[in-house]
Amino acid sequence: LLLLVLSLTLTILSGNPQVTIYSFVIVSLFAIIRLWNGGTLRSLINTFPILLAVILSVALSAPQLLPSFELVQKSIRATESYIGQSNFGLLPIKDFLKFFVADFFGNPVTRNYFGFLNYFETSGFVGSLTLPVIIFAAIFLRKTRIIYFFFLLLVVSVVLCFNNPLSYFIYSFQIPFLTQSYASRMLFVTTFAISILSAFALNQIKLRPEKQDNFLKCVIWSWAIFVGILLGAWQV
């Protein structure tokens, strides 16, 4: 509980409202999924420590939160439209490649970056070998409530940070904190969900050697998918 309080407090104090809101929503939903068992009363008792941790973290962060709210009310961020000029920071489909090839569109260090926006706001690199692991998780990993939760988290975050009619419609509204910065910051949630699912998949491969043949199939499929995305990006 103390570790959770400390983590949430530091998240607030980090000064990134979007990431803070994402973190609190994920923690709350995960607590409900993980601890909501049996009757209503028992479930409320199980989730009370999480609620207490959230309240304590907000209370500890009050010396920063209160002046920040006053500053936001006087800020022009709510009325300016700078993110609209960059399509709200919604990523083009070709940026899927950056999940597995970080420098596919160059790197600012070598001064050859030619991708969308800037490198740091749009990079969701999770490792070159992650794609077959995610495919394995989607097809062969034993599904539980927690696994479904992280898959849903992955799908929702991808939809919201990439350019499509639904994400554009949502970001066309002025939702405080959430739609006042680039949508690509949702990649924080995407990479988190991918990391968790990859860990579950690798653990199952390690504990059940008979699953290794299935993993090899996923490696072949992943190469086919990657080549397809690469060819599609080349056409774009």
Each language-model region and where it sits:
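Periplasmic/ER-lumenal interhelical loops and adjacent helix-loop junctions
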Residues: 53-138, 183-188, 232-236
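Transmembrane helices and adjacent periplasmic/lumenal helix-loop junctions
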Residues: 6-33, 56-68, 189
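Membrane-interface helix-loop-helix junctions at transmembrane boundaries of multi-pass membrane enzymes
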Residues: 38-48, 134-166, 208-219
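Hydrophobic alpha-helical membrane-interfacial segments at the cytosolic entry of transmembrane helices
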Residues: 42-69, 83-86, 149-158, 217-230
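Membrane-embedded alpha-helical segments of integral membrane proteins
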Residues: 12, 18-25, 184-191, 215-236
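Membrane-helix boundary/interfacial segments in multi-pass membrane proteins
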Residues: 113-122, 152, 156-193, 204-215, ...
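Transmembrane alpha-helical segments
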Residues: 25-33, 131-138, 194-206
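Alpha-helical transmembrane segments of integral membrane proteins
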Residues: 20, 48, 120-127, 147, ...
